[in-house]
Amino acid sequence: MIKARDEEFVATLKELNPDIIVVVAFGQILPKSILDIPKFGCINVHVSLLPKYRGAAPINWVIINGEEKTGVTTMYMDEGLDTGDMILTEEFDLDDEITAGELHDKMKDRGADVLIETLKQIEKGTAHRIPQ
């Protein structure tokens, strides 16, 4: 397993000099030494309507709490846990009978679409930074 704070990993990323880093379900908070590498930032795809359900298992919490709506959010990463400025959010209604597995699959598809649009906006210089 890759450790985000591993010095060798950070050095490899610096050598690669990426323009942007995209993280999906990584499960680790990126240190400032990584966040500062890409010129267009580090982007996270989070499967909730931030700021609600930051952190782990947002799909499960949405179902446990009986939410009627949920969604996918892209955000610029910062040193906090899902606290960075939001870029795009897509909201949708939930079926009362949806399972975590079904919602995961729906989020995967929606998340890919939102990520593609986010990257297009960043490339054009039109991406917004919406504080949480």
What are these regions (language model features)?
Residues M1-Q132:
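One-carbon transfer enzymes
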